């Protein structure tokens, strides 16, 4: 036997269909748990599309891991299938706004995903103007489709509202002659609408839905529905209930629950355990928390991370001081002073105090930081305190990997 024969595991002793535990896996309807009402409401909003009529524009809110994207993708796929049965040509396009956050990136992604060989229209990755991308998109839509649903996932990550204006008013503005567009925006931020241009708000927010967090029972059911990702008999009885309880404590996040289950299996693999044991769940939860936060700050600027590092260091020092209350908040000036020290250590010029305030607001928008206003009386006036909502140890570890 050659050495290479010992390098790889030819038969996975833990997983039989690991894809069921991937976040981007779209399950069949029977595997979508606890969202029957939401799926029905969303389907009702876009139902006119199966007859070649304009679907309602929809905005979906809810915390991370509440099934928003999953249900929107499922309904979009079913609409295309049902429209085809009615003799209506339909398509759906998906944009990850965290990845394609500029207007040009987003419209290029949409045009590329709905383009077909029959159009003879070329959609390059780059090299043409935003206006040209739009012109080609409108041509493709009118040439190929009666109805198109466009899903903008993490819509709050878009740099501006320009593409929302273009899409929501394409028919009204005469950009499209026959094709009808429906937009489904998905956001983790319930206050996202407050940042919208009023004209966009009036046309995009025709229907709004809020997805509530899953409870422990629903999370348990979700993981049971995906447990055939594992080989028979490898999951100890307490694994799924334990993972469900941990995820329910963390705002009912199904994404985290599935991550924990997958990571627990991977820990069993790496330790050559014969079964996935309950003790692996706690280790898996720590890894899931780290990965979730790393994803949350993906794409943030160095100075955004320096500001967060300053608040994290203050939080860690406060925790070590037994006289300091838990969840201690810190004034902007204290955060700024430490931020300046970090900039000097990193050999970087510091930003202004005003810009650091803006960065702290951005962290608050992402629910990484909580801001509260206080009155210091006539002598001090009012001031803002910033409290880190994440585990400081997790933030410290992630920032250590991302700050060079």
PLM regions: where:
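A short, basic N-terminal segment
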Residues: 1-56
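Mid-core helix/loop region of P-loop NTP-binding domains shared across ATPases and GTPases
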Residues: 2-7, 13, 99-111, 116-166, ...
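Walker A/P-loop nucleotide-binding motif
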Residues: 54-76
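C-terminal helical "lid" subdomain and adjoining coupling/linker elements of P-loop NTPases
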Residues: 59, 233, 242-303, 318-323, ...
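Conserved catalytic segments around the Walker B and adjacent sensor/switch elements
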Residues: 59, 82-99
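Short, hydrophobic-biased segments on the C-terminal half of alpha helices
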Residues: 76, 164, 357-361
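Hydrophobic residues on short alpha-helical segments
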Residues: 304-312
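Terminal-proximal interaction/regulatory segments of ATP-powered molecular machines
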Residues: 322-404
């Amino acid at each position: 036997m050659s050495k290479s024969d010992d390098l790889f595991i030819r038969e996975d002793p833990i997983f039989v269909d690991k894809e069921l535990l991937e976040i981007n896996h779209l399950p069949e309807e029977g595997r979508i748990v606890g969202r029957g009402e939401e799926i029905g409401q969303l389907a009702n909003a876009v139902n006119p599309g199966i007859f070649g009529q304009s679907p309602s524009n929809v905005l979906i809110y809810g915390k991370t891991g509440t099934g928003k994207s999953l249900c929107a993708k499922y309904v979009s796929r079913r609409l295309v299938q049902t429209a085809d049965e009615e003799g209506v040509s339909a398509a759906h396009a998906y944009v990850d706004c965290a990845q394609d956050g500029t207007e040009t990136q987003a419209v290029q992604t949409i045009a590329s995903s709905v383009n077909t060989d029959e159009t003879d229209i070329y959609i390059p990755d780059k090299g043409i103007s935003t206006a040209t991308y739009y012109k080609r998109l409108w041509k493709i839509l009118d040439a190929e489709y009666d109805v198109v649903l466009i899903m903008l996932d993490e819509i709050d990550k878009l740099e501006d509202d320009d593409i929302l204006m273009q899409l929501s008013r394409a028919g009204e503005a005469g950009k499209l002659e026959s094709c009808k567009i429906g937009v489904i925006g998905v956001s983790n931020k319930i206050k996202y609408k407050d940042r919208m241009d009023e004209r966009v708000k009036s046309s995009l927010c025709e229907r709004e839905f809020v997805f509530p967090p899953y409870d422990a029972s629903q999370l348990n059911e979700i993981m049971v529905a995906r447990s055939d990702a594992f080989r028979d008999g490898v999951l100890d009885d307490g694994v799924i209930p334990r993972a469900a309880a941990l995820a329910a404590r963390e705002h009912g996040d199904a994404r985290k629950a599935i991550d924990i289950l997958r990571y627990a299996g991977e820990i069993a693999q790496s330790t050559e355990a014969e079964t996935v044991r309950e003790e692996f769940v706690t280790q898996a939860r720590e890894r899931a928390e780290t990965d979730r936060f790393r994803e949350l700050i993906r794409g943030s600027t160095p100075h955004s991370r320096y500001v967060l590092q300053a608040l994290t260091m203050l939080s860690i020092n406060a925790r070590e001081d037994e006289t300091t209350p838990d969840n201690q908040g810190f004034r902007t000036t204290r955060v700024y002073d430490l931020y300046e020290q970090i900039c000097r250590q990193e050999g970087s010029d510091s930003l202004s105090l005003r810009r650091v305030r803006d960065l702290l607001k951005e962290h608050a928008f992402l629910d990484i930081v909580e801001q509260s206003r206080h009155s210091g009386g006539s002598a001090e006036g009012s001031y803002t305190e910033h409290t880190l909502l994440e585990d400081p140890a997790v933030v410290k570890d992630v920032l250590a990997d991302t700050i060079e």
